[in-house]
Amino acid sequence: MSESKSSRQATLRYQMELFLLAVSFFSRLPVPSDLPYSEERMNQAGRYFALVGVILGVLCALVFYFTQLIFPDSVAIVLTMAFSLLLTGAFHEDGLTDMADGIGGGMTVERRLSIMKDSRIGTYGAATLVMALLAKFVLWSELVHLPDFWLVIVVAYTTSRALAATLIYDMPYVSDSDTSKSKPLASKQSSSEVAILLFTAGVASLFLGVIQTSFIVIVLFAFRFAFKRWLTKRIGGFTGDCLGAAQQLSELLVYLTLIAFYQNI
């Protein structure tokens, strides 16, 4: 009996450590400095990426709630967006920028991958980043008057990270695994890990409503199919930057989908 209890405690502790690894990878939130790390653990932590999205979404929703008590909605939106960038270290935005530079500026697969590794921002990346941030501001401005706007943020942050993480499941990793920060994530996911991602995203979305969730699922599945085919054609697989781009683009698609839904009911 005691052995069984000890085994359960060890399992729970291990899963908590995986979750904290996911938090440390995707955010600037503090985690214990003695947290065990290995590439295998980091790869397994991918199952909790959507749950990290829940945490980040809730924190951003709280910032918006308190700032809009003091400032106009537009100012509260800008402050919340700034907080989100600080919270994540602009991790996903950086991926979107690098992917845009690489695929936009490279004429061959090798050149595209080489440009993605360059830390400098080019024309394609700068334009894409500006458009993405502007789009987020405009879309939030359209949704801000919904009584459950805070929940929209949580759902978008959660589902977009789930979608990005699932690309690891059925796409080859094509970056230089010796130098890439995303190397630990490059291994294939198990079906159970994908199921955890989808379950987390599904539960969060259902709080918006079954119909809204259905529309979001349809749109994101269509996007994933198209984005996967596009990446395969352009670079033959995915890189860490592509995962960041997938998160950013799918987050914007969630907002667009909900605007279209509420506009036509």
UniProtKB/Swiss-Prot annotation:
Cited Pfam families: CobS
What are the required cofactors? Mg(2+)
User: What is this enzyme's EC?
Assistant: 2.7.8.26
Residues that span the membrane, as ranges: 51-71, 72-92, 121-140, 203-223
Output the superkingdom of the source species: Bacteria
* One GO biological process term: cobalamin biosynthetic process
Q: Which InterPro entries match?
A: CobS
Q: Which GO terms describe its cellular component?
A: plasma membrane
What membrane topology does the UniProt entry give?
Multi-pass membrane protein
Task: Please indicate if the UniProt record lists RNA-binding as a keyword.
Answer: no
Q: What class of enzyme is it?
A: transferase
Quick check: keyword Nucleotidyltransferase in the entry?
Answer: no
Q: Name one GO molecular function term.
A: adenosylcobinamide-GDP ribazoletransferase activity
Q: What catalytic activity does the UniProt entry give for this protein? A: alpha-ribazole + adenosylcob(III)inamide-GDP = adenosylcob(III)alamin + GMP + H(+); alpha-ribazole 5'-phosphate + adenosylcob(III)inamide-GDP = adenosylcob(III)alamin 5'-phosphate + GMP + H(+)
Where does the record place it?
Cell inner membrane
Q: Which UniProt keywords apply?
A: Cell inner membrane, Cell membrane, Cobalamin biosynthesis, Magnesium, Membrane, Transferase, Transmembrane, Transmembrane helix
Q: In which pathway does it act?
A: Cofactor biosynthesis; adenosylcobalamin biosynthesis; adenosylcobalamin from cob(II)yrinate a,c-diamide: step 7/7
Q: Please report which protein family the annotation says this sequence is part of.
A: Belongs to the CobS family.
Which purpose does this protein serve, as stated in its record?
Joins adenosylcobinamide-GDP and alpha-ribazole to generate adenosylcobalamin (Ado-cobalamin). Also synthesizes adenosylcobalamin 5'-phosphate from adenosylcobinamide-GDP and alpha-ribazole 5'-phosphate.
NCBIfam families recorded for this chain?
cobS, PRK00235.1-3
Q: What is this protein's record name?
A: Adenosylcobinamide-GDP ribazoletransferase
Gene this protein is translated from: cobS
